[in-house]
């Protein structure tokens, strides 16, 4: 139950990041610089925690560790951030959140390919897992492509984009193909990182060391890209505005605090369990977007959200049943082993007593 509560809280935190990023993107911020600052702040925040609280879990720095950290940093930090924000600039906050719904399907397919997930279609749990994952993907399609009538659920609105440079233009523009591909590419990279964490997460040390290494590599890559693409040093100046808030929030809270929590859920429940909570994030972003970002809420959005949430609960039920079944099987095997040892011990005792 702790992992369920943790992942629901993660979706609220991610939803806040979506809204802040949308406001920042529409304000004309240099996105490469924003990403570089985000991952740098995350590294600066997490590294002292790793040194203080997980000193004994510090991994041995070998060439293998550096290679794993580099791959983890690319898939989990650099590539998703480099693709995601420009993709959001070409779409909307709601669509960007909706696109993450395909993550369970991507993770399930890749998990089956790499034999990290099981799908026993002969069992009720296996069939339900497949149906739940497909429901999430179908709900996302309904959410994006079926509009229906516009729903007005708020009696008043707060327009957070009113003071932005490009607020009205970007809020009402059509979703571009390039933006869709960039956002989807970000989700694919994140799914690969989730599977990588399930496989080699323990080799990167404790959760704090794992996060520090990933963000450190990601920040180094993003800083190099930002410096090579833009030589205007004024773009690197941070003021007391929404850009600083978005950078600190996404860097310290999301990349710093949330990533270790997600890594813990991956280690205890598996990568598919983590991804199926994405629809909750979409519902939150859609509600906030309709209230504060002037993004209209349609009937199709509500229907799609209900379908996706149903898929989430179905997959969570399957994972809980699988864990209970695995625990029961393990206890049964252990009991049989103990009984067998007891029988052998009794037989040995009888043999000694026979003259």
UniProtKB/Swiss-Prot annotation:
Keywords (A to Z) from UniProt: Membrane, Repeat, Transmembrane, Transmembrane helix
Superkingdom of origin organism: Eukaryota
Cellular localisation: Membrane
Recorded topology in the membrane: Multi-pass membrane protein
Domain EamA residue range list: 12-142, 210-316
Signal peptide start-end: none
Keyword set includes Transmembrane: yes
Chief location: membrane
InterPro entries, alphabetized: EamA_dom, WAT1-related
One Pfam match: EamA
GO cellular component assignments: membrane
Residues annotated as transmembrane: 4-24, 33-53, 65-85, 94-114, 134-154, 175-195, 207-227, 244-264, 272-292, 297-317
GO MF, one example: transmembrane transporter activity
Assigned protein family: Belongs to the drug/metabolite transporter (DMT) superfamily. Plant drug/metabolite exporter (P-DME) (TC 2.A.7.4) family.
Name of the protein this chain belongs to: WAT1-related protein At1g25270
Organism encoding this protein: Arabidopsis thaliana (Mouse-ear cress)
């Amino acid at each position: 139950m702790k992992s369920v509560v943790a992942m629901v809280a993660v979706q609220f935190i991610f939803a806040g990041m979506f809204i802040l990023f949308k406001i920042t993107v529409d304000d004309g911020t240099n996105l490469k610089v924003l990403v570089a600052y985000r991952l740098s702040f995350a590294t600066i925040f997490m590294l002292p925690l790793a040194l203080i609280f997980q000193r004994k879990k510090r991994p041995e720095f070998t060439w293998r560790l550096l290679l794993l950290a580099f791959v983890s940093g690319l898939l989990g930090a650099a590539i998703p951030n480099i693709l995601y924000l420009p993709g959001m600039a070409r779409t909307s906050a709601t669509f960007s959140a909706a696109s993450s719904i395909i993550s369970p399907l991507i993770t399930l397919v890749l998990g089956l390919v790499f034999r990290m997930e099981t799908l026993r279609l002969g069992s009720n749990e296996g069939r339900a897992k497949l149906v739940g994952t497909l429901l999430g993907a179908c709900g996302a399609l309904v959410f994006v492509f079926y509009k229906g009538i516009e729903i007005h659920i708020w009696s008043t609105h707060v327009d957070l984009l009113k003071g932005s440079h490009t607020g009205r233009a970007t809020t009402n523009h059509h979703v571009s193909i390039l933006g869709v591909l960039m956002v989807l590419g970000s989700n694919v990279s994140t799914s690969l990182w989730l599977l990588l964490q399930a496989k080699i997460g323990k080799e990167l040390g404790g959760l704090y060391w794992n996060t520090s290494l990933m963000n450190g590599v990601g920040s180094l890559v993003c800083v190099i890209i930002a410096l090579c693409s833009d030589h205007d040093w004024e773009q690197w100046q941070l003021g007391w505005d929404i850009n600083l808030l978005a950078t600190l929030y996404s860097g310290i809270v999301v990349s710093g605090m949330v990533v270790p929590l997600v890594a813990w859920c991956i280690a205890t429940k598996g990568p598919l369990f983590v991804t199926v909570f994405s629809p909750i994030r979409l519902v939150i972003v859609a509600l906030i977007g309709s209230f504060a970002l002037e993004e209209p809420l349609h009937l199709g959005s509500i229907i799609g959200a209900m379908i996706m949430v149903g898929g989430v609960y179905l997959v969570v039920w399957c994972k809980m049943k699988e864990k209970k079944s695995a625990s029961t099987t393990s206890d049964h095997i252990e009991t049989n082993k103990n009984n067998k040892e007891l029988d052998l011990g009794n037989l040995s005792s009888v043999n000694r007593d026979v003259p």
